Amino acid sequence: MAEGENSVFFETFNRNKRSLSLNLNSESGRRVFEDLVRSSDAVYSNLRGDVPAKMRIRYDDLKHLNPAIVCCSLSGFGMTGPRATDPGYDYILQGIAGWMSLTGDPDGPPTKSGLSMVDYSGGFVAAISLLAGLHAARRDGVGGDCDVSLFDSAVTMLTYVAAWQMNSDFVPARMRNSSHPSLVPFQNFEAADGWFVVACAKEKFWERLVEAIGHEELAESEDYRTFSDRRVNREELLSRLNAIFIEKPVSHWL
């Protein structure tokens, strides 16, 4: 990066955006900001949950300037509650929300995902919330606050894993080779020269798999005929598939 130029990281997220720095604690900065609010559709912030109130950028602070303004806050833990003053970062939220207890191998440590998925998902939820707020404001002429938190977004994405645990005897755990907790085979497999993924999400995919690898007898076995059968006999089936896949390179299987 040459002096005076933006980093590749910065350009990844901000290319073609225009920016303006304002000190909202100064009279001149506040005046410019309020002029912008009068002619804008939305005010978006990505700050600690208690900061929008301190900076006076919530709907109640700005509605006298523009009754239709939509104020969206994306924070770690929301603008209210016991953790509103806590900062929130992707890595921390992956741990707090339980993602790391589900990621990695069973005999390894809790592991974060390779990408900042809490940050990304929180941003998507904030964008959807903001769009809903804008739709309502254009329909009714009244804006409001959109209070979005990384924590809420991350917990929401536990979906079926959380539902299984709360409604059955299922206990979420890290699965070897990134395998699916109920679908078998649905995971990474090692070939002679690398790794690839097999994903039998439907019975017909299982039938096609055994035909493609030349082991139709697996589909005929009563031990592997259905989803339930393969789940019960997971270890035995995976051992057989591992022995088959390791014999040939990835290009052969794909």
Sequence positions of predicted segments:
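N-terminal helix-loop segment corresponding to the beta1-alpha1 unit
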Residues: 1-145
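Electropositive phosphate-/nucleotide-binding environments in soluble metabolic enzymes
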Residues: 7, 27-30, 34, 111, ...
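Glycine-rich beta-alpha junction loops
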Residues: 76-78, 150-155, 193, 201-205
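Short beta-strand->loop
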Residues: 115-121, 150, 198-200
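Oxidoreductase and adenylate-handling cofactor-binding alpha/beta cores
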Residues: 123-144, 156-168, 210-217
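Short, well-structured alpha-helical segments that form the helix of a local strand-helix-strand
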Residues: 146-152, 254
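Conserved ATP-binding loop and adjacent catalytic segment of the adenylate-forming AMP-binding
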Residues: 168-175
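Aromatic-enriched alpha-helical interface/lid elements that frame and gate functional surfaces
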Residues: 179, 184-254
